[in-house]
Amino acid sequence: MIVKKYQMEVAGRPLIVEIGQVAQQANGAALMRYGDTVVLVTATAAKQPREGIDFFPLTVDYEEKQYAVGKIPGGFIKREGRATAQATLSARLIDRPIRPLFPKGFRNEIHVVATILSVEKDNAPDVTAITGASVALSISDIPFAGPVAAVIVGLVDGELIINPTVEQHQKSDLHLAVAGTKEAIMMVEGGANEVPEETMRDAIFFAHEEIKKIVDFQENIIREVGLSKMQVEIPILDEEIKKAVVEFATPLFEEAVKNPDKKTREDQMDSSQKSVLQHFTESYPEEEKLIADVSDETMKAVVRKMALEEGERVDGRKLDEIRKVSCEVGFLPRPHGSGLFTRGQTQVLSVTTLGAISEEQRLDGLGIEEKKRYIHHYNFPPYSTGETKPMRGPGRREIGHGALAERALLAVIPSEEEFPYTIRVVSEVLESNGSSSMGSVCGSTLSLMHAGVPIKAPVSGIAMGLVKEGERFAIMSDIQGIEDALGDMDFKLAGTEKGVTALQMDIKITGVNREIVEAALKQAREGRMFILKKMLEAIDKPNEELSPYAPQMIRMQIDPDKIREVIGPGGKTIHKIVDETGCKIDIEDDGSLFIMATDEEAAKKARFFVESIVAEVEVGKTYMGTVKRIMDFGAFVEIIPGVLGTSGKEGLVHISQLAEERVNKVRDVVDIGDQILVKVTEIDRQGRVNLSRKAVLKSAVKK
């Protein structure tokens, strides 16, 4: 067994690729070491094409292992279960830049597995896995037009940084994952803190310079250990038959696609497709599949030609024209906030729920973030596209779209100090014809403002498309479903008036250059501002008051040493407060205490109980107290009453301090149960409280 090791530096840390030591049964395997982060990436391929499919069967799995960060998995079973949301997002991150680089028409099943074996938090395993996937595929016999590489770009104090450390990431206004080949960008994914479009552009191409170096590094590896690629036999239709199909199908599709209504257009396109097949399969029955493929390509060519040569789209819009936008808030009466966003035939209902801080989501992954208090979920039911499918929970697409919309709003969500609530937004896609994820961004903004969440600025989003033939290209604003399916790029961008908060770019060709990225960013901003203006017509700022159905929140700060008094032995005291008031109470280690109630009176009552428990006796302060015990030398007076079975705070009024004149017997002045005004004169070293009634009487006489 020959083991090969290759090394280069990326962002000042060693990137080591090991070939030949592990996973030798796979078509290709690479053990990637980036600092102390270790990722094994394997690529395997079926020997024969999968029959009866019209798509490329690529599967990418990202396997997080808890031992990689020295953890034992939680739960009863104590082993890793189904993929976490973060693992799903990482798998998608690997899939997107490699998928366009396989041969067109390739139908062999491909399985790429990235297993995370060790994680050093300064060195991200997901982008390391993208480079690892490229190495594994490139050195294997699987046909692949790579290599590709990926890096993360941060922005700290105005300076762009490759692969920022955890400390740098916490200060960064940008977290952008960029993947590409030596020639072009393939994929961009990230979030930002209202960063200008020009800076985003610079970040993308700053990343590309580093990517080129990593690609050069991979090419050296491939030259040394790369295998010969397997022969792929992709059936091709006879040129004469193909020419006849194109000539027959083109006028049918030119008429069918020019219908603004999605359902009518799809019906006409299906009818045209059937006409083509009926016309040719009688003469060439054995070529039916290839004829259908050419017919699909013809339809695609018609749509693309309209955009490139005529500057027109299937629904009659210009390239930069946005579909009709309508916005409504308060669509639902009982939820804490709701917004209905409609753009053309895409419609999203976003609903906001406010909850206690303790309801924030706790994450059991490999990252440094262990909890989050802003949560966005995206649902895409089959009826939204007029289809019938089983509904079995969120798939990879729903998780990815939900995360993108969540990232878009994260930069404007108020801090816990400003707004001590956990916030959950659910976006229900009611109708979809393109860009439902960006519809979720707009709907979320409307819903949050209606709920009274003091977001820093409203956020709008838009999806851009691309048609590219040679050096010619056309960029389309607010793409619909057919333009997404038949175009070369899906470029989603969200942000405020000030700048970008989220960006996602998926390329279906072999990459895009600087000119295209610049043009797309500029045109996207114009579209975003148009949509934002429409949104602000529905609601121009967050409501000042929360919904009457939202929980009332009182925030208190108590001495951390008093936390155990509020909780009580075995939680007895805090449970009594909850039972008595119906409130929910959360206490943090720093003494931050949150009272959440369905009505204001209950919250005030709970606050009174807490204040009574943690109250401290103050020297010099006058209290109305109750005489609890009488001794020969004085009376013990409770000055802070106990609540819910807790002990109150009392002090001693010495017999000499009961009155201005001499007192022979305590009971001559006070008796048990009497309420008297007393002043705290001293708290001695043992914590004993000395009180004086005489001092209060003297003060009253002076007045």
Curated annotation (Swiss-Prot):
Gene3D superfamilies named in the record: GHMP Kinase, N-terminal domain (3.30.230.70), K Homology domain, type 1 (3.30.1370.10), Nucleic acid-binding proteins (2.40.50.140)
Needed cofactors: Mg(2+)
Any one GO BP annotation for this protein: RNA processing
Domain S1 motif stretches: 620-694
Record CDD domains: KH-I_PNPase, RNase_PH_PNPase_1, RNase_PH_PNPase_2, S1_PNPase
GO CC annotation terms, alphabetical: cytosol
NCBIfam families, per database record: polynuc_phos, PRK11824.1
Protein name (record): Polyribonucleotide nucleotidyltransferase
Name of the encoding gene: pnp
